[in-house]
Amino acid sequence: VFATMEGSPAGKNGSIPGMFISCETMEQAETAWQRDEVQGLYLPYFVMEQAMARGIQNQKELYLAFPYIAREQAPEHFFETALRWLEEGMKGFLVRNLESYGMLKKQGLEKSAVLDTTMYTWNNEAVDFWEKQGILKNTVPLELKEAEMRHRDNRNSELIVYGYIPLMQ
């Protein structure tokens, strides 16, 4: 579960504004998109296909989650499909490594990027660098301590508040 670091006061029913859920299965996505407090979903390609076919993009912000490991180029027709989904209402991409960011930049889609915790944003200099690249937002690194977070510019950041985090990604 991702939540924005700063935002408006609690929404209706005391919900947290800006709550985003990263789902690995369609079952998880179906459960999450039905919740009012959830603003958006991060979905892998095969789940995004199903979500877009069901029109979930008309109810929630959807972001295509890149895999943790990327090769030199995206699979055939990946960006053709992603561009179509953007036209149909998908909001952007969850980027987990520099290779994926490079692929987005090559396609002119870097301004649709949300950086995951695996992308370097440990300090204000790194945050400033990525903001100059035009990304939508970043995610606070998992390893940061509270004191380090207090000294970091978190205005355009998400913070993971709950989840299963594998030891090695």
Identify what each model region corresponds to.
Residues 1-169:
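Non-catalytic helical/linker scaffolds that mediate oligomerization, partner binding
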